[in-house]
Amino acid sequence: MPRRHRFAAAIAAVAVAAVLLVTLTVAVVTHGDGAFAPAGTPAGAGASAGIGSDTGSNASEDSDMFPTIVFGDTVIERKEYVAALKAQHGAARLYFRQTYGVDPAEDGWDKAHDGEVPCRWLASRAIDELRRRHAAYLIGVDLGQVADDSYASIVARMEAVNSGNAELKSDGGIVYGRTGFDIDSYLSYELSALKNAYTGDESNPGMSLSDDEVRRYYDEHDWTKDGVDGKTPLDEVRGNVKAQMRSERYDELVSQRAEAIDVTDLPWDALYRFTAGRLG
């Protein structure tokens, strides 16, 4: 199957899975260290009310100037960065509450705590998130799954999906999964599809697993199955073991690709000022 067709199939699989997850609780096989458990959302992670709109209404003229941020050949758009700030806003508040016992939203985003400034921490965290996201898309570009890693292309694909779903629904067709996406839900949807397409193809780098590798990984972890006492035999969880191995290998590939995106020379001071303007 051509790679673009594999990616399209993965997109469809993610859409169907989204429907199933709403109605089913699946707990057949679990990884002993919790790898199969869905990650919980930390307290306050969804809170982004403290991030200003992208109109600059709460920022000074100087802080409203978004600096030029480039990852390789890709320019990071202002809207993309602001969305990343919103996504990491809750994590920043949680980190400073747990580490220093302060809430930046109340104590101030520009007040240093043992050398760490919440505003700068948040900006760095947002950039790290964007590095990982673009790394995943660049892997998809290498395999011909997407044309490029630009935010404009992502938005265009989202709009095409939304338009196609709306047209199908108006014609009486059945839309499996979400009928419409905002940018956050579409990013999650498409990044999952990219990962599924990559890990589902054994010919991709890092996805070929030897029997010895599978056995070693199985031996190093606990595997349980409903109705089975003790550790489940390898033959009964081999598929899950391989899936987990490929998932971890893919995540490591993304991490390595993200690390290769050099941000040393980014205009950090200007970015901090812009970020402070969003939090003002």
Swiss-Prot record:
<dbReference type="GO" id="GO:0005576">
    <property type="term" value="C:extracellular region"/>
</dbReference>
<protein>
    <recommendedName>
        <fullName>Chaperone for lacto-N-biosidase</fullName>
    </recommendedName>
</protein>
<comment type="subunit">
    <text>Homodimer.</text>
</comment>
<keyword id="KW-0964">Secreted</keyword>
<keyword id="KW-0732">Signal</keyword>
<comment type="function">
    <text>Chaperone required for active expression of the lacto-N-biosidase LnbX.</text>
</comment>
<feature type="signal peptide">
    <location>
        <begin position="1"/>
        <end position="37"/>
    </location>
</feature>
